[in-house]
């Protein structure tokens, strides 16, 4: 922990007054100082015989600004917990979504706490992109009167672990702000670190800011609020930690038999649960690992599966822990490092010195295949200590309750690959496609995403860019726009390898076009000709018309791959704005940032 003097702005004295006071009291003894304190107290409280003085107004309460930069909801939930802690400690707090934060006011912040997640290749959460760009621009102000703390959320299975948190921490310090606490970089299993950090933040702020004598103020929004079809706000009893047990009603392959992709349309019956969602939200899916994978791992380690282990204080057989509580299909560099030490495998130990090769190995080699390639004799507790907790997967919702009512639809790309001749599949996608039977129970919850919403005005034009399974939320958008009778124009850009095999929801899109609900559709089939064509090529081709729609107030939505597609699409948008808007590169970038701030450029990328 780093301890520093509070900024002078937190005191009810100006720097000049503070300097004069410090100079004056230097010549007094402790006894004289004690007498003076009573003398000043008497002046303030107008005791008999005290020298009258003008009443001094109490300084306004110092508010802690708490910024949540969340991608999948974890940062938001942690920020909400910290907000509650600060309020309980009688401190005033303003919790704000990074996408709603007026970042030009950051120079006025005195106490700033940032909870930041990282997405893709070290990029900030989508809602924090504009703030991140501003802080790293020439317009960023000096922050010498600001004290701050940063908690970074990330995943060690990615190369740029917690990079967004590191960026915010280093840039705030570079701009002159003072650290209240050292930055925390937390992995997927972040709860223990988060609880300790919350306690440290509260204690540190209590030492710097007097508790409010009146009720502390807050500015925030409900955590689990959902909007019903009638427009009222409800609080759902279901969450990531308390999911709804629903039933699978439809599981259908929507790619052709000769397609290189296996994409499934999934429909889940929510029954009379009352679970509500909006177009743009995601569905969280809890899953069980493949029993065959569990048996394979146990056999490789010469374990029976009935060995007792403890998971979060709950005792259970090892086989049950591997099936339902521990991650088996994702590896990380940290796991490789620990396993190399236990196995003493020379190949793995040598790999640790080559960071790029280590990252690639962890990404492409599931834990069970690492054990097969580098055998070791682990006991049950050692195995459990190596593996990460199972986490749910999020899927963009492909339906609107205005049409499907008590159902929720998702579009799932099934992950399939071979390693050393052995077929492997993704944890959740394999569960949904291969192991979960129709009418079977499935645990789900809604992850609300207020950063991917249809425009409030039904007359506003909408541009949707979603290749592959990125088309999912736009199916929900079109269902909603049709039910609402929205008069605004709709334009879809979709792409996949082959027209005949990979045109997801083809009949539905054709109907929308025929009935005039979908104004335009541009399709990119990357493998149907000698040269590859992607959605970004179609965007560039339609640049002039695209600019016309933007000038008419269109909202732009992008869904799909964050690492390649989304970056390429953004570059084309910048090029279109520069060319047709007669701007240079810097002006185009600022223009796109303004669209993002106005919620006219929204992305759901992963």
Curated annotation (Swiss-Prot):
GO terms for molecular function: flavin adenine dinucleotide binding; FMN binding; oxidoreductase activity; sulfite reductase (NADPH) activity. NADP(+) binds at residues 526-527, 532-536, 568. Gene3D superfamilies: 3.40.50.360, NADPH-cytochrome p450 Reductase, Chain A, domain 3, Nucleotide-binding domain of ferredoxin-NADP reductase (FNR) module, Translation factors. Its cofactor is FAD; FMN. Its EC number is 1.8.1.2. Residues 64-202 form the Flavodoxin-like domain. FMN binds at residues 70-75, 117-120, 153-162. One of its GO terms (biological process) is hydrogen sulfide biosynthetic process. Belongs to the NADPH-dependent sulphite reductase flavoprotein subunit CysJ family. This is Sulfite reductase [NADPH] flavoprotein alpha-component.
